[in-house]
Curated annotation (Swiss-Prot):
Residues 150-185, 228-263 form the EF-hand domain. One of its GO terms (molecular function) is calcium ion binding. This is Dynein regulatory complex protein 8. Gene3D superfamilies: EF-hand. PANTHER family: DYNEIN REGULATORY COMPLEX PROTEIN 8 (PTHR46763:SF1). It comes from Homo sapiens (Human). The gene is EFCAB2.
Length: 269
């Protein structure tokens, strides 16, 4: 019978590694700390584990750590001596997963991966961008070479129309017509500046193709002169195409361009 205020305490029961039940008050002592399992739960017992055996006990599974000294009270620790570390029992797979998570989060490794990863991505992006830019520049250079070759061809054809002596020279008075035939519409001042640039140091009244070609190529590439308005071109074509065929032959175009009197661009009728 329990008296007033008394409570019956249920003995705690542990299961040792062999599967046997060991309870408080039973013969012998529970197994070593770290291998206790509470009956029915399978959980390891920590702070609620049963008391350690007295000094000198030979119970299996209990080892005296460096903190125990003969004659000292149980649990007393030697000053400056670290307590022994207990194995956490982490499996290799769990440890690998933890290390992978640590690498991804950067925690505990002395750096912030949130800063390093974007920096790495930026470097990779710049490297990839550099390769793309190099490829793009290669294509652009190849395209420009094609464009320059086309310009050279057009300039040569327009120049040859007025090279009556076939000696790679034209009359300086024909330069304006040649430039306009290439789709440019310079002002009078721009035309005078160009002629001054391509003329010889001692003006002869003629312009050599070798000096005209690079200057005119640069003008076409940089589009220095405003283009001839489309309505002007259309009106000129309608005047020249008197038969209303919708096209002009090369001979007709040369004839019209080399006529001394020129052609009026006023609409007929």
């Amino acid at each position: 019978m329990l008296g007033p205020g008394q409570v019956r305490l249920r003995p705690r029961v542990w299961r040792d590694k062999a599967g046997g039940r060991v309870a408080d008050g039973a013969s012998g002592l529970p197994p070593a700390r770290g291998s206790w399992r509470e009956t029915g739960t399978g959980r390891a017992l920590g702070a609620s584990s049963p008391p350690r055996p007295a000094q000198g006990s030979s119970s299996p599974g209990i080892q005296s750590g460096p903190s125990s000294r003969p004659g000292s009270p149980r649990g007393a620790e030697q000053a400056g001596t670290p307590r022994p570390r207990l194995s956490l029992g982490i499996s290799q797979a769990t440890g690998s997963a933890a290390r992978w998570r640590t690498r991804r989060t950067g925690k505990g490794l002395g750096y912030n991966s949130d800063e390093i990863r974007p920096r790495t991505l930026l470097i990779e992006h710049l490297m990839e961008g550099g390769r793309r830019d190099h490829h793009t520049m290669t294509v652009l250079w190849g395209t420009q070479e094609i464009i320059v070759a086309e310009f050279h061809k057009k300039i040569k054809e327009a120049f040859e129309v007025f090279d009556h002596e076939s000696n790679n020279t034209v009359d300086v008075r024909e330069i304006g017509t040649i430039i306009r035939s290439l789709g440019c519409c310079p002002t009078e001042g721009e035309l005078h500046d160009l002629i001054a640039e391509v003329e010889e140091e001692e003006p002869t009244g003629y312009i050599r193709f070798e000096k005209f070609l690079p200057v005119m190529t640069e003008i076409l590439l940089e589009r220095k002169y405003r283009p001839i308005p489309e309505d002007v071109l259309l009106r000129a074509f309608e005047v020249l195409d008197s038969a209303k065929r919708g096209f002009l032959t090369k001979d007709e175009l040369i004839k019209y361009m080399t006529e001394e009197d020129g052609v009026s661009l006023r609409r007929p009728g």
